[in-house]
Amino acid sequence: MATIKVDVVSAEEQIFSGQAKFVALPGEAGELGILPGHTPLITRIRPGAVRIESESGDEEFVFVAGGILEVQPGAVTVLADTAIRGKDLDAAKAEEARKRAEETLQNAKSDIDLAKAQSELATAMAQLEAIQRLAKIRGKH
């Protein structure tokens, strides 16, 4: 089966680099599925899980807190604001971040504070959802 080169990078480090049969991620207008031969594309991505199906059929999960997706012939690049490997996700930290964001939202004094709190809440909720999805998948194996 055909594959495509996939790179997931954050400002801090390269999170994933390898060949894949399929990539799924949260695009700005909805969930995107990328197969080899996909039309070139540049779009923003929302916070959520990136699912990468490797050549061997294994799945790799990476949580991204938003960023940019670039699809070129033979290559997919995810430039993430923040990226965390699925195995490194921490439900307790994500839940604490959600609570802090909700508190900040309640006490927002300006539009800037409100927008920041909404963004932090969306990221924490997406991270918790990614953790739940990953737990379901791990439970099947």
UniProtKB/Swiss-Prot annotation:
Cellular component per GO?
Answer: plasma membrane; proton-transporting ATP synthase complex
Q: Which Gene3D superfamilies match?
A: ATP synthase delta/epsilon subunit, C-terminal domain (1.20.5.440), F0F1 ATP synthase delta/epsilon subunit, N-terminal (2.60.15.10)
Localization recorded for this chain is:
Cell inner membrane
Q: Where are the transmembrane segments?
A: none
Report keywords, A-Z: ATP synthesis, Cell inner membrane, Cell membrane, CF(1), Hydrogen ion transport, Ion transport, Membrane, Transport
Its membrane topology is listed as: Peripheral membrane protein
The protein's matches in InterPro entries, at most eight in alphabetical order, are given as: ATP_F1_dsu/esu_C_sf, ATP_synth_F1_dsu/esu, ATP_synth_F1_dsu/esu_N, ATP_synth_F1_esu_C, ATPsynth_dsu/esu_N
What GO molecular functions are on record for this protein? ATP binding; proton-transporting ATP synthase activity, rotational mechanism
Pfam family, any one: ATP-synt_DE
- What is annotated about its quaternary structure and interactions? F-type ATPases have 2 components, CF(1) - the catalytic core - and CF(0) - the membrane proton channel. CF(1) has five subunits: alpha(3), beta(3), gamma(1), delta(1), epsilon(1). CF(0) has three main subunits: a, b and c.
Xref: HAMAP family: ATP_synth_epsil_bac
What NCBIfam families has UniProt attached to this entry? ATP_synt_epsi, PRK00571.1-4
Q: Give the function comment from the record.
A: Produces ATP from ADP in the presence of a proton gradient across the membrane.
State the family it belongs to.
Answer: Belongs to the ATPase epsilon chain family.
Give the protein name, as stated in the record: ATP synthase epsilon chain
Specify the species. Burkholderia mallei (strain ATCC 23344)
Which lineage ranks, top first, belong to the organism behind this chain? Bacteria, Pseudomonadati, Pseudomonadota, Betaproteobacteria, Burkholderiales
